[in-house]
Amino acid sequence: DTSKIIETKYNAVEDNSLVINKEQVNENIINKKFQLIDARSEKRFLGLQPEPREGLRSGHVKNSINLPFQLLINEDGTFKKVNELKRIFEEKKINNEKDKAFLCGSGVTSTVLGLAYSIISGKKPVIYDGSWAEYGLD
């Protein structure tokens, strides 16, 4: 059984409010306006495992919360059930009182956290696109 591909026209609209930069991350260390959640492994977050990219220091952004993206995924690659996702976020003290932004090593797996957050909260996720690949250069 093959699916028929139907041509369509899609107009993408850029929304810069869903992306933050390094300056905003640094400001947040002081003003704590949003929770910054890191999708990397716990060992990388804690600086116990070297970064795969040469030239990056180990560690994490001050005041950020570690939530390895793998915790949200079943063995078959699907997301865990909504109630499980909520429980995991709650266990990590990620709440709805503050806005959220997500980062990872390169800006890719942070979107897994962002989508999971969107599923459980109905809010659009905000991503630090530079992620640790940018932040870890300092």
Please identify what each model-predicted range represents.
Residues 1-35, 39-138:
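Rhodanese-like catalytic fold shared by cysteine-dependent sulfurtransferases
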